Amino acid sequence: MKHTVSASVILLLTACAQLPQNNENLWQPSEHISSFAAEGRLAVKAEGKGSYANFDWTYQPPVETININTPLGSTLGQLCQDRDGALAVDGKGNVYQAESAEELSRQLVGFKLPIQYLHIWADGRRVAGAPYRILPDGILEQYGWTVGRTADSGGQVRTLQLNNGNLNIRLVFTEIGMPSETETPERCAARTR
């Protein structure tokens, strides 16, 4: 009898451990994403080569600005999106513009990066109205990218991992909160220079 109870408990625990995960509530469609300011580290791997940098990212609709910095804090470049399109400013002050951040990234680095969706995916949501698939492990597939996300106990993003087969991007968030600016900008700061 003792062995029967032990075997039953083991079978029950094994069965529970193998129940399929309910992914229905993962990656809900995007609605209004609140403003935020974040800092962290960024790693990009392409064709066996990797690059690392720090980032600070401010999302205040309609403006989104991502600064890429060296580990010592020098700015390597800035990407900004607003209603007028996207622009990038390199460390030498050269300005590049395009209709979208995706097109701008294709022009500058040769890859269409899904920059215009990062704030949605970082919030744990999918782009509403666009085709998607949620894999059994909870990974989102959208726009040709697999998107994984980890969060802290309060639901704030800790890591965001993107992969399209050729390019792997990993953002590790060390701080996330509200922007310090009290006024919401209407345009990218680089447009007003």
From Swiss-Prot:
Monomer. Plays a critical role in the incorporation of lipoproteins in the outer membrane after they are released by the LolA protein. A lipid is attached at residue 16 (N-palmitoyl cysteine). This is Outer-membrane lipoprotein LolB. A lipid is attached at residue 16 (S-diacylglycerol cysteine). Belongs to the LolB family. Keywords: Cell outer membrane, Chaperone, Lipoprotein, Membrane, Palmitate, Protein transport, Signal, Transport. SUPFAM superfamilies: Prokaryotic lipoproteins and lipoprotein localization factors. It is a lipid-anchor. The keyword Protein transport applies. HAMAP family: LolB (MF_00233). The keyword Iron does not apply. Residues 1-15 form the signal peptide. Its main location: membrane. It is found in: Cell outer membrane. GO terms for biological process: lipoprotein localization to outer membrane; protein transport. InterPro entries: LolA/LolB/LppX (IPR029046), OM_lipoprot_LolB (IPR004565). Pfam families: LolB. GO terms for cellular component: cell outer membrane.
